[in-house]
Amino acid sequence: LGTQMKATGEVMSICTNFEGALMKAIRSLEQHVDCLMSYDFSYMNDDELEDMLRQVDDRRIWVIAEALRRGVAARHIHEVTKVDLWFIDKLEILIEMENALKEAGRKIRSGMPVELAFPEELLREAKRIEYPDTVISRLTHIPQDEIKRMRYSGGIRAAYKMVDTCAAEFAAATPYYYSCFGSENEAEATHDRKKVLVLGSGPIRIGQGIEFDFCSVHSTWAFKKEGYETIIINNNPETVSTDFDIADKLYFEPLTPEDVESIVDIEKPD
């Protein structure tokens, strides 16, 4: 602790696999980061990188990712950082996908047809572990609109699962959803009332705190009074807006254009 003001906000993400949940959490931070390449440590030599590995700060996950790119053994990273090997193995899976997408981009630039260099199976797996279209586009050099078209033509769309709030101890149905790819959609869109979709304010930061969540909650209540079906998208576990009984439906998702658009496509709010 010191005299410098620091934010204490947090994000929460849910997915059917850890890799996907981590990718969602990274882009939920809303700090111009969207993947494990968002901080560049490639300019460091190996000794400098190892010194960075020993430092505990908010960039450590990106430092570990750079070490994995350089072929540093997971066991050595564990010994230096004391991060459990299970988590390092999961980061390695994300780095392997990053390398596969970069290789597809190299093949495309060398003249190989896109459908051969970037098969649908690779796109499907990238989306399963929640690589956003923006990152896939950046790594493969395929325009983002074309990535989206390829996804839709292959039926690769986000599906929404209901959160089991009782850990399967007994049946529980709550209107509380998270996205994943490759599963059956459980968020049935209703059309008996007009709908309004409220975007939450995401993680608490310096200058953005509970007063913004107050606005989200009270606007939701106001629309409810007017007879609207209310839907909230947010990713902050500390807030009132992510209580599952505030709105008719809650989507626990990042607030990026792609994530929001996927929900809009299903719900079609007025």
Where is each model-derived feature located?
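ATP-dependent carboxylate/acyl-activation modules
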Residues: L1-D270
